[in-house]
């Protein structure tokens, strides 16, 4: 998938690298029946307090209802269009099934308009098809993986990512995730064959602060530039050191390398190898 690099005509185009959407997107208007309103939170929770810092503003969006469950087993569907989704890094594909129903799915890499996909235990091993892990050969590249049967895909959904089915042992399959973690997942859980689309997303550079603001992201202020009341690194005269043996988060936790995962989680028994 090509990217567009701009000539340095202005300071904002000097480092700008964007996805060449015209070479990928086949339809600009979304399917109205698969849209839902999406209200902005500005990073606030139900109490009105900031729960995620540096969020707010951005262009208005409508949510695209995505079929993560892929539960239309045995019914073939034809890829009608590849579309842009402002709510995720990957592209989405509009699928028209043989019974007339339309659904959005995460667009796998190398999928094209006109391709036919199908889900279910008898589906062939082909890019875009969704099967239980028990029916997928070991070594296959997969994405949109369920954690619990029937809940819908929760793992490996962002642009350009993929996982690999390493082995099967009894009721569980060994899956290597993009982080390097090897995890046990029930073989009844479904996964989609192939990689997620938009592999060049990692090469994108906004080029200017304004493009980041369009996405709803506000400037990230350094802790050393704050007052002591706002951050453990704050205060001091001029460019003074942070005043602590190691860097701290705004809430006083050690950061930059300090492991924050809680010990003795119920899911620990499903992790064969920790992430790198």
Swiss-Prot record:
**Composition bias type Basic residues, residue spans:** 210-220
Q: SMART domains under this entry?
A: Ribosomal_L2 (SM01383), Ribosomal_L2_C (SM01382)
UniProt keyword Metal-binding present: no
Q: Which GO terms describe its molecular function?
A: rRNA binding; structural constituent of ribosome; transferase activity
Cellular-component GO terms for this entry: large ribosomal subunit
- Translocase recorded as keyword: no
Q: Which Pfam families match?
A: Ribosomal_L2, Ribosomal_L2_C
> In which family does this protein belong, per the annotation?
Belongs to the universal ribosomal protein uL2 family.
Q: How does it assemble?
A: Part of the 50S ribosomal subunit. Forms a bridge to the 30S subunit in the 70S ribosome.
- In Swiss-Prot or TrEMBL terms, this protein is called Large ribosomal subunit protein uL2
Source species, please? Coprothermobacter proteolyticus (strain ATCC 35245 / DSM 5265 / OCM 4 / BT)
